[in-house]
Amino acid sequence: LMSEILDTALVDPDDDFVETVARRLPILMISRVLGVPDDDAAQLFHWADSVVYHADPEFADVVFDRDDTDPYRLLPFRSPTSVKVFEYAQRLAEAKRIDPAGDIGSLLSDSDDLTAQEFNTFFLLLVIAGNETTRHGLSHAALALADHPDQLDRLRADPGLMPSAVEEILRWSCPQLHFRRTAQVDTELRGVSVAAGDKVVTWYISANYDEAAFVDPFTLDLGRSPNPHATFGGGGPHICLGAWLARLEVRVFLEEICRKIHRFHRAGPPVRIRSNFINGLKHLPLELEPS
């Protein structure tokens, strides 16, 4: 799949790497895991963008024409587009009950343990988490390799670096900037008292560039070891459910890049998503020089 995407991108006149490459692999992968038809994937993930990028005018569907937004209170990010995703999820669940397959959508729709609302919200979670962050990880990877061509040459010359290269790309890109946690017990963290029930924001991006944890953290080093990055949450019960799928996608991406792409060349400035939650690129003009 990644090979086909790159082959298409190499002959595609559109130089926006996000559109031609980075968004396509995770969209198709998570769609197939969930049992979503390929033809529905683009629309579904357009809705997902509208939900999660609520602070960016290019994507947002924030409600401005009413004072009372309480009807949206229980929707993710208070986004009305969530309802469209929920409606799609119910149609998919009904179809899977009639004609099940070996996908996650079929397994979840056949479960008596989930209410319709729980199925809807879990489906939306998988659509967002299985797509958005990996897309940005791949975009940041391409930008990093455009700016550090020596590292691409190094990886191509020594494929044994692939495991450490994957982890370094994950550390470097850190698509999820932060998450909030709730302290379960009274504790103390580096001299700061934290009471049970306190909300604590964990800044993954800060941890990934912590000079106390990494040697030269602002240097891209595809052979970095050890690499105790916090991109997936740093461990514990809240570690990212899709960590292994994300690692697989990054690895396949790098393997195919080494085979097919000699160089990435910047064709314009990258455009960031307006968000303090997601470290994302919505446009990345790159020229791809084939091997």
Where are the predicted features?
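Cytochrome P450
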Residues: 1-291
